From Swiss-Prot:
PANTHER family: EXORIBONUCLEASE 2, RIBONUCLEASE. SUPFAM superfamilies: Nucleic acid-binding proteins (SSF50249). Its EC number is 3.1.13.1. Residues 562-644 form the S1 motif domain. It comes from the Bacteria. It is found in: Cytoplasm. Keywords: Cytoplasm, Exonuclease, Hydrolase, Nuclease, RNA-binding. One of its GO terms (molecular function) is exoribonuclease II activity. The lineage of its organism: Bacteria, Pseudomonadati, Pseudomonadota, Gammaproteobacteria, Enterobacterales. The gene is rnb. It comes from Sodalis glossinidius (strain morsitans). Involved in mRNA degradation. Hydrolyzes single-stranded polyribonucleotides processively in the 3' to 5' direction. This is Exoribonuclease 2.
């Protein structure tokens, strides 16, 4: 009787339109219920039965109902699923396959089967790539996924690498060397510098050596520095298949234990690498460095043949300069080059301290792995004098390239950083004012004003203020037009010194060569800058994910013990504090209840970067404290710490 009743249909439509609805993102919990987060301030409870229809991270619309004076959300429509392509672990039960996503807040056991063409037999614990095919909010009865690839087997000790690379859709191996690749020479003949005593300084294990340096004394206490950089663009013409591969990869991917090169290893580790006692093509920059650290306006770029006279290691060179250890340079000529480079480093560093900015030295942490991929040790490698010598030479060369490209072409690939966000600078000024540092907002938006503030902050006893105002700064980015780099305190900066490892540096090589009659200049487009930024983000996330996994493996035996670790507070949020363990670099989380058990007496404030207990400040960002490890959660590779 009511089947086609227009009044009833109208009433249904009216009720539907009057029912309040919201859009938001589902946040799962480990207890079965969840929340629909509409914005930073507003969220709605989702009961366990309704959570079975959605997943953590799904963007949905939901009906809002009130039950027992509490607003709850009932999922109604899927706007954007959180899971599309994902990595998971296979479960096999009664010959039926399921996959559990590798995500800390997604525990759904999703029915699955391999898609057509995936022929492997799967076993419980295997890692796989899967794609979602069905979702309850799309009218399907249940979640369902298809396995599109096997990542690795359950017992593979190298799973951290393969799973991470698959998660970020990154290559597992070096590109293959195409047939017929040869050195392409056009334009002016290369200058023969093979008689000069060039040296390379790098890590002892490095094979892909980009840079070699030669120094000669000049009148009035100056130095003539020649920086020779590997010349892969002589082997890789623009637009060639190999160039397309390099553009796609964008960078060599450095992960703990090994790297995945941007170019075939025959090029990156051999034909292009500036190996000792091997004649190699190079793009060179020669510039005069004055005794006060300034650069003369005589930078000249040219192609050359060079022969490195020694592959030196950072630690050996540093030890020798600091009169430590037994290592000695092979020849007096190499010793002279080290001394000259040391002198130039001191002059340039002093100039940058006064007129630009110098980053604070932070140690590197190196995983020592055995043949099974397990971590035997984590070694702290402080940045020493030899590292700084190479850094100063490369910064000098990049400044020269930035100026030559700016004046000669008006474009290139520039690293730019504009300091404070103009929309947020007043907040930074207010924080500085509360700490008795008076600055003018307009000054902070200039390169000079930014540098002056950074020097004042670097002189502070702790990093607290620096970390507080860092969030009001813009991010560094790659631009096709010249611009300042506030973080370095320089008016222009364009890198070209790592072309074996960075595609952006290859582009700048081609532009610099065009200015000296080798090839044509083609202005890079915005698509390239976006690709470089995206690939850099992917590689950094991959390095972090592998590192987190290895840290969890390494620290798991110490969880629950009395072992103490010195740690620095790097972030404070409502839920607790993130700290970095200083003797190995691992990041751990200290939950708020571990700081103080009475929640109402505890305030963890991200805005002030402090932790207060009963109104008294107990911790602030940048403080160091001792912690023990309460727990290591292997399922999400996280470390939970407790203050001592």
């Amino acid at each position: 009787m009511f089947q086609d009743n227009p009044l009833l249909a109208q009433l249904k439509q009216q009720l539907h339109s009057q029912t309040p609805r919201v859009e938001g993102v589902v946040k799962g919990t480990e207890k079965g219920f969840g929340f629909l987060e509409v914005d930073a301030q507003k969220s709605y409870f989702i009961s366990p039965p309704f959570m079975k229809k959605v997943m953590h991270g799904d963007k949905i619309s939901a009906v809002v109902r009130t039950e027992k004076e509490r607003e709850i959300a009932e999922p109604e429509e899927l706007i954007e699923p959180f899971l599309t392509r994902f990595i998971g672990r296979v479960q096999v039960k009664d010959e039926r396959l399921a996959v559990v996503p590798d995500h800390p807040l997604i525990k759904e056991v999703i029915p699955t089967r391999p898609q057509h063409g995936v022929d492997q037999m799967f076993q419980t614990g295997d890692w796989a790539v899967a794609e979602m095919r069905r979702h309850p909010l799309k009218g399907d009865r249940q979640f369902y996924a298809e396995i599109t690839a096997l990542v690795t087997r359950a017992d593979d000790h190298f799973a951290p690498w393969w799973v991470t690379l698959a998660r970020h859709n990154l290559e597992r191996a070096a590109p293959t060397m195409p047939e017929g690749v040869s050195l392409q020479e056009d334009g002016p003949a290369r200058e023969d510098l093979t008689a000069l005593d060039f040296i390379t300084i790098d890590s002892a294990s490095t094979e892909d050596m980009d840079d070699a340096i030669h120094l000669a004394p000049a009148p009035n206490g100056a130095w003539v520095m020649t920086v020779a950089i590997a010349d892969p663009t002589a082997w890789v013409p623009a637009g060639s298949p190999l160039d397309n591969i390099a553009r796609e990869r964008a960078f060599t991917n450095y992960l703990p234990g090994f790297n995945i090169p941007m170019l075939p290893r025959a090029l990156s580790d051999d034909l292009c690498s500036l190996r000792a006692h091997e004649r190699r093509p190079a793009l060179a920059c020669r510039v005069t460095v004055r005794p006060n650290g300034t650069l003369a306006d005589d930078a000249r770029f040219f192609t050359a043949w060079i022969e490195s006279k020694g592959k030196l290691a950072y630690d050996n060179v540093s030890d020798w300069l600091e009169n430590l250890g037994s290592w000695q340079p092979e020849t007096e000529a190499i010793a002279d080059q080290i001394r000259l480079l040391h002198d130039v480093c001191l002059a340039r560093s002093a100039w940058r301290q006064r007129h630009a900015l110098v980053f604070k030295d932070r140690p590197d942490y190196r995983f020592v792995l055995n043949e099974k991929g397990n971590v035997d040790d984590i070694v702290v490698e402080p940045r020493r004098i030899a590292n700084r010598m190479i850094e100063e030479a490369m910064i000098t060369a990049n400044v020269c390239a930035a100026r030559v490209l700016r004046d000669g072409l008006g474009y290139g690939l520039y690293n730019v950083h504009h300091g404070f966000d103009p929309l947020l600078v007043d907040q930074a000024v207010a924080i500085l004012h509360s700490h008795q540092i008076e600055v003018d907002p307009a000054d902070l938006l200039t390169l000079e004003g930014f540098c002056a503030l950074r020097r004042r902050l670097d002189a502070q006893p702790t990093s607290y203020l620096d970390s507080r105002i860092r969030r009001f700064q813009t991010f560094a980015e790659v631009s096709t037009v010249p611009g300042p780099h506030f973080g370095l305190g320089l008016d222009a900066y364009a890198t070209w010194t790592s072309p074996i490892r960075k595609y952006g540096d290859m582009i700048n090589h081609r532009l610099l060569k065009a200015l000296i009659g080798v090839g044509d200049a083609e202005r890079p487009n915005e698509e390239v800058t976006l690709r470089l930024a995206e690939r850099r983000r992917q590689n950094r996330m991959a390095e972090r994910d592998v590192g987190d996994w290895l840290y969890a493996r390494f620290l798991q035996p110490k969880a629950g013990s009395d072992s103490r670790f010195a740690a620095e507070i790097i972030d404070i949020s409502r839920g607790g504090m993130r700290v970095r363990l200083l003797n190995n670099g691992a990041v751990a989380f200290i939950p708020a209840p571990f700081i103080h058990s009475v929640r109402d007496e505890l305030v963890c404030s991200q805005d002030t970067g402090t932790v207060q207990v009963k109104g008294e400040e107990r911790y602030r960002q940048g403080d160091t404290l001792d912690v023990t490890l309460a727990e290591v959660r292997m399922e999400n590779r996280s470390v939970i710490a407790r203050p001592v």
